[in-house]
């Protein structure tokens, strides 16, 4: 079985686990090569990166990536790597890996597994699958993090519902979890967020959120 056939078989397996097979899965079943499959992934990206198929990608894609890499990269999709010149078209999938994955420029990164991710430039990181994701945001990056741990620096922006550490000129919107702030530009906290900060300056609280000095 070729790597493409392995991925397509995984699609079949995911589809069988879903009572009403979503349009994204049905579209993948019709693909005949990796280029067509990558086009479907782009069209239905939220289903791919956030749905049941994400778990199968995390488990099976790394082994097949070496063979599929050239065609996937041509479609702007990378696995556990990112080119330094990365326009918004670039998507980075991060699976379970022991290597540090660095994301550059304007790439959009989707963390599916246990990994260390460092983001630079104006890149964006989305993590909603793994509690063992460790993410560092630098420069002008953006993070939308509902699973994992985050350290945010420089002028990065962050939406979070987990435990985060913010420094420098970071803007943080927290919906639960904890915010540990040394320095920051602005913090807006809602839900039951706990904000650990030596100052109350530029901190807005909603709901049951509170500051712990």
Regions picked out by a protein language model, each given a short descriptive name:
Residues 1-213:
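Short, glycine-biased loop/turn motifs at secondary-structure junctions and
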